[in-house]
């Protein structure tokens, strides 16, 4: 976040633009914090991130991260607005894919799991990962 704030100080943008960009940076800053909480929860309960059920959501998060990295570069270098809007649409498509994936995971979980503790822990992780997916699409939690 510091790099973006420094760049803002060197760039001519209106105070409104500067405030929006700083809000955007703070919004993005929370994503790694959310991911850290997921990792902590998984470690606390001895859950393996390599489980195939978690990988579906993790793959979506990685795709979103790559898109967001490109979008931030577009903002910094004031590049093609059309490409930026295309990336926003792709983020929203990934968010919808995340919603669909969550529904599939929950359906499978409730159909297959007989262990209540495992069911609750996995559901909790699914929900936390879904919040990360939503965050990239700029959905408030």
Give residue spans per PLM region:
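Cytosolic, long alpha-helical scaffolding segments
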Residues: 1-141
